[in-house]
Amino acid sequence: TMWIGFGVIALWNIFKEKLNLNTNVAAIGALLLVLTAPLIMGFQNWDDHDRGSHQGSRDYAINFLESCEENAIIFTHGDNDTYPLWYAQEVEGIRTDIRVINVSLLGVDWYVNQLRYKMNDAAHLKLTFTPNMIKGNIRDYVPYVNNPSIDKNKYYNAKDIMKFISKDDPKIKAQTRYPYYVPTRKMSFPVSAEAVKTMNMTDAPDSLIVSDMRVDLRKASLQKNDLMTIDIIANNINDRPIYFAISVAPSAYLGFQKYFQQEGLTYRIVPVENVSGQPTQS
């Protein structure tokens, strides 16, 4: 832009001084000459840059949504994963019963608070943490602290762990230096037989279906988005189908990958453990 401006001034001086044109005519002539470059570029390159018929992103988003059962929750990761799905829902009205959750935004209080309300045809989410419990930087970082009273071989109900982390107990800070902490890396997520049946979770034989999904956290601490992911799964797994988009980074799986069942472009969390560690096929 700067060099175009210099070019206009130079041409204006040439027209004015060399061709003896008045100021207005010289300025118009210089401007017309300079405009030929972007006009030619526009005519020659329009077809190369026209995105009017490019629908790959839209089709990809619709495939994600159509991979889910009714009233589902799907975790996505980042803008490119999420915005096309929101477009399909908000603009084209496709699968508005699904709640799309961007795990990258779960560390932000205002975004989490939106999940407490119905969105289009998607019901609100059940959460342990109130708005004040996650306001601003509260619980942005929740470390794991070894607790001698905790049995290291036992899996504890994730709902109970979330309730423990939600407490604001001065005694905890006095004992650990932290206002809240994760007391165990072993969490269980009970799944009722009724939920398995009514939500058609899996076609696996009953002998392979577990009543408790057991997850081993490999992290030394939980960020707020990790905390909220666990809380959402713990509180909603018996009410709604829950999925991860296949494009989500493995670091966001939090150990659930051994319970993944691939359905279309998603991994659904089902109470069937994969010994191989690879998602089963539906």
Regions found by a protein language model. Name each.
Residues 1-71, 86-282:
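ER/secretory pathway lumenal C-terminal domains and tails of membrane proteins involved
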Residues 83:
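Short glycine-rich, flexible loops that bind phosphorylated cofactors or substrates
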